[in-house]
Regions:
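Short beta-strand-centered segment that lines the nucleotide-binding/catalytic pocket of NTP-utilizing
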Residues: 33-48
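Inter-motif core of Ras-like GTPase G domains
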Residues: 96-123
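Beta-strand-loop-alpha "switch" segments that mediate conformational coupling across diverse proteins
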Residues: 149-217
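Extreme N-terminal, non-catalytic leader segments
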Residues: 1-9, 73
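Loop/turn-to-beta-strand initiation segments
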Residues: 79-84, 114-116
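Glycine-rich phosphate-binding P-loop
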Residues: 9-26
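P-loop NTPase switch/communication element
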Residues: 45-61
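Switch II (G3) loop of P-loop NTPases
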Residues: 81-99
Length: 236
């Protein structure tokens, strides 16, 4: 099988869709797997993703040429390190304009770098419309549609909601109980380390609920990762 490198683009055209949470969970998943990821945060102001992983995530302002070079050139490096981009909703349009104008996706494919788009959806009509537009512009790009119940409100059945999007790959992040969420220091708490070595000074109820929530997410990441490996046989 031909080796490949992976770039994960986590994005949404709207705020409060769970982009940073999803990027964080994916980073923690790779840490749990023993594969430290390299991250990029395109929000130059609050930079929540970079603040969470100061030694792994670089802040890039893609409204500037310098920021664009810093991000996109580094994404075209072929190695075994997964790269994760947290696309700020205000950078969303600019990010995809650059992809289109530079032929970035085609260059990445030439270098055996697979772009995996994790599209964080919500129930606003523009969310589905934008996903379909991206799918039409880059039909060969892998798209995973994510529903994060802790960030966006879903009145409809989540499975039915996800089925409307132009991909059969999906990710469902359940809402974490508020009491459990308040029990951990999100800025310094490592989900990967928690799964490896659960703290015994944590409430057994909180520990059980958090583990169940994480296992549900990480199992989906594992399934999606295996699916990508299977799909790689197309490029032999």
């Amino acid at each position: 099988m031909r080796p490949r490198s992976f770039v994960f683009v986590v994005c949404s055209p709207h705020p409060r869709a769970g982009v940073t949470t999803t990027a964080t969970l994916l980073t923690e998943y790779f840490a749990w797997r023993g594969l430290p990821a390299e991250g990029f945060d395109t929000d130059p102001y609050e930079s929540a993703f970079a603040n969470r992983f100061p030694n792994q995530v670089e802040v890039t302002d893609i409204s500037t040429i310098q920021g664009q070079i810093s991000l996109f050139d580094k994404l075209l490096v072929f190695d075994d390190k997964p790269r994760i981009v947290d696309v700020w909703n205000r950078s969303f349009q600019k990010f995809f304009t650059i992809l289109q104008e530079t032929g970035f996706a085609e260059e990445a494919r030439r270098l055996s770098i697979e772009i995996v788009l994790i599209y964080c959806a919500d129930e606003l009509p523009a969310s589905l419309v934008t996903a379909k537009q991206i799918s039409m512009l880059w039909p060969d790009m892998t798209m995973i549609v994510a529903a994060n119940e802790g960030a966006a409100e879903f009145r409809a059945n989540v499975a039915q909601f996800l089925a409307a999007f132009p991909t059969r790959l999906n990710l469902h992040i359940r809402e974490l109980d508020q009491q459990v969420s308040r029990s951990i220091n999100k800025d310094s708490f490592s989900y990967a380390e928690f799964l490896k070595n659960p703290p015994f000074d944590m409430s057994i109820i909180v520990r059980s609920a958090l583990r169940k929530w994480l296992v549900h997410v990480f199992t989906q990441f594992q399934r999606l990762e295996q699916q990508q490996v299977i799909n790689s046989t197309e490029y032999l």
